[in-house]
From Swiss-Prot:
InterPro entries assigned to the protein according to its UniProt record, in alphabetical order: NAD(P)-bd_dom (IPR016040), NAD(P)-bd_dom_sf (IPR036291)
UniProt record similarity statement: Belongs to the NAD(P)-dependent epimerase/dehydratase family.
Amino-acid positions noted as binding substrate in the UniProt annotation, renumbered to this chain: 133
Domain of life of the organism encoding this protein: Bacteria
Protein name, UniProt field: Uncharacterized protein in galE 3'region
Positions annotated as active site in the UniProt record: 159 (proton acceptor)
Length: 164
């Protein structure tokens, strides 16, 4: 299987890619802009693996995403790219809106256009997983509180609102 991972140089994305490369036969294309949150050193242990590929790409760049989809031909997309620091989102929400909302839309459109060109059997199998954050549910008020699948969104920062 071919898996396109956005934000793969980030904390969670790099753990996902290391797991895929170390525990499956799947091939990965890691798309990451390499901002303050991205660090290719977190992928050093797999950097020589021929199933691990990297592209320094901004998910807001539709042409670069279209090329990545057409060249790599993924079966699955795992979308983890995001601006992710709550305090930074309060000080300057524009980058969070740009990456987390507009970038996600651009990625979805690139995936949709790619999907439209797939044969029926590949269309049926194609998946896009958007990995978000528990912050979209707001704050827990006690140690006994839990979020469930039925918990309503209640974001409390520009970051969590941009991921809802």
């Amino acid at each position: 299987m071919k898996i396109l991972v956005t934000g793969g140089a980030g904390f969670i994305g790099s753990a996902v890619i290391r797991h895929i490369i170390n525990n499956t036969d799947d091939t990965v294309l890691n798309i990451d802009k390499l901002t303050y949150a991205g660090n290719l050193e977190s992928l050093q242990e797999i950097s020589d693996n021929p199933r691990d590929h990297f592209s320094k790409t901004d998910i807001c760049d539709s042409e670069s995403l279209k090329r990545a989809f057409n060249d790599f031909e993924p079966d699955v997309v795992m979308h983890l790219a995001a601006e992710s620091h709550v305090d930074r989102s309060i000080d300057g929400p524009a980058a969070f809106i740009e990456t987390n909302m507009i970038g996600t839309y651009v990625l979805l459109e690139a995936a949709r256009m790619y999907w439209l060109g797939l044969p029926v059997e590949r269309k049926e199998a194609f998946r896009l997983h958007h990995i978000s954050t528990d912050e979209v549910f707001g704050d827990l008020h006690g140690t006994e509180d839990l979020f469930t699948e039925q918990t309503a969104y209640a974001p409390s920062s520009p970051y969590s609102a941009s991921k809802a």
